[in-house]
């Protein structure tokens, strides 16, 4: 057992930080006792409004209803760019570091404004209007941020699709959001490899006849398919466009973006976030969680295809007039010192990454870290999944040299911004704990009957009051949002995560309690993977569960039952893995695929995934009650054949 130590707030950190523990306690109390007063003050302090709101909040969590800053009008791009121009027009807004260490760029706020306005005018010239959906399928290059902000500027709703998703996944997201415009690049570059983005778009669009415009950024100058009249080059269109584009006044509750996340029922959910509340959540958490001060260089290593990239590469930092770093590459290319080299090269002060990356780099040993200085670092963050105490301590002692507090943040695509987190100047740290709630956030633990657990204990993590950046809908299927997040425990937001609360009130996230696997910080629905596997003619049935993985946090373990007449083989296994890669993306390929003559089912035909989870995790002494199975003998057969031995 790893002994948990407590790390008090260092004096130097407390003296520099915006908030100490007394400040936290006072503001937190105000935020839950007088939420309208608190959030009204914050919205005025953090955002510029074209028109004031007439009510801070109203809604009913039992019905999943939340309206924030009703009547207020603002524009996200204006808040992220225009209002900074007078004071910091020549300040660097985006530092871009390419996949190849020889490539980098610095974009000032003035240049950002220029490019965003021109791209916004290009979109308008192609018929994009307020409320239209635009799909962005891009590598990690500055143009991805320009595209998001250009949409926000004219009131279009962007749907960013991670560049690692397959053409089929891209197609499904374009169709679900009814996008008529796609912004992409010829190719992406990642870890020295080229990703055929435009080719993938072409495959996806075979089934998307309504797409009338594809804007293509030239990244590699590789050969790509081209449809005359529909496809336009980004650089040519920008050159011809005006740099004058007024920011559209948007209602606080107007949609800002749709972002697809895995669901336990198979079909990805288009999480809808709105303008005012979302931007306030992103800006406020960015400032206080990362203690961002003028002049700091801030680096979040996420991809903009995930919510972390939305909130903590683009919207939160830019709303605060920050310098934010965008990285095209991967942690181990050209070698395992790359992250630390980038930190030295750009004098990064605040670094935010995922436990998966930390664990992978920890396995490479201390030498790649020690060969760099990292003296600029002040704070280290963790996001995407719980960080195990061993990785936490390595991150703290080796990477941060015991100088840098670790900000272990818990939040989700649906929450829009960080909900449970330490604050650098206020929170003593415990390795592996996300510690305490952010302002206005009221977490509770619920038992199996849905009753709140008092004091220390373990249960389902839920939130019992609305917060500004919460999900507003699932695009095109509002009932699904209610059924998923608000129906399981009426009066609460159901997170899908389990948690433990210790005697100090600190929260420890214990992992998913629903059928979603967290692989390297990517949420993958088990039903999505199962659906992909059963597309193969040889597969009769598939059941997918998660099991522990030293680096990725969780691995995907698939049990596959074949059709009569089909035989297990290495070739078939490779076909199935390729099929999952094609349908979802290579990151969703099972790590283990076990042939299962039959699966453990109840008499009503329900697969007992609990038992499969135990087999996958090799927890064979705690299988629990198998008497309700239609054929209990199935279990021993699966145990005997675990990992196809």
From Swiss-Prot:
Please give a single GO biological process term from the UniProt record. acetyl-CoA biosynthetic process from acetate
| Residues noted as binding CoA in the record, renumbered to the chain | 190-193, 308, 332, 520
> What InterPro entries does the record point to?
Ac_CoA_lig, ACAS_N, AMP-bd_C, AMP-bd_C_sf, AMP-binding_CS, AMP-dep_synth/lig_dom, ANL_N_sf
Keywords linked to the UniProt accession:
Acetylation, ATP-binding, Ligase, Magnesium, Metal-binding, Nucleotide-binding
User: SUPFAM superfamilies recorded for this chain?
Assistant: Acetyl-CoA synthetase-like
Residues annotated for Mg(2+) binding in this entry: 534, 536, 539
Enzyme's top EC category: ligase
User: EC number(s) per UniProt?
Assistant: 6.2.1.1
Summarize the PTM comment.
Acetylated. Deacetylation by the SIR2-homolog deacetylase activates the enzyme.
The cofactors required by this protein are: Mg(2+)
Residue positions where N6-acetyllysine is found in the record: 606
Instruction: Return one GO MF term.
Output: acetate-CoA ligase activity
Under the heading Pfam families, the entry gives: ACAS_N, AMP-binding, AMP-binding_C
- Positions annotated to bind ATP: 384-386, 408-413, 497, 512, 523
GO CC, alphabetical: cytosol
Query: Which CDD domains does its entry note?
Result: ACS
Q: Which reaction does it catalyse?
A: acetate + ATP + CoA = acetyl-CoA + AMP + diphosphate
Instruction: Give the protein's biological function.
Output: Catalyzes the conversion of acetate into acetyl-CoA (AcCoA), an essential intermediate at the junction of anabolic and catabolic pathways. AcsA undergoes a two-step reaction. In the first half reaction, AcsA combines acetate with ATP to form acetyl-adenylate (AcAMP) intermediate. In the second half reaction, it can then transfer the acetyl group from AcAMP to the sulfhydryl group of CoA, forming the product AcCoA.
Spell out the NCBIfam families in the cross-references: Ac_CoA_lig_AcsA, PRK00174.1
Please give the PANTHER family that the UniProt record associates with this protein. Answer: ACETYL-COENZYME A SYNTHETASE, ACETYL-COENZYME A SYNTHETASE 1
Q: So what family is this one in?
A: Belongs to the ATP-dependent AMP-binding enzyme family.
Output this protein's name: Acetyl-coenzyme A synthetase 2
The top of its lineage is:
Bacteria, Pseudomonadati, Pseudomonadota, Gammaproteobacteria, Pseudomonadales
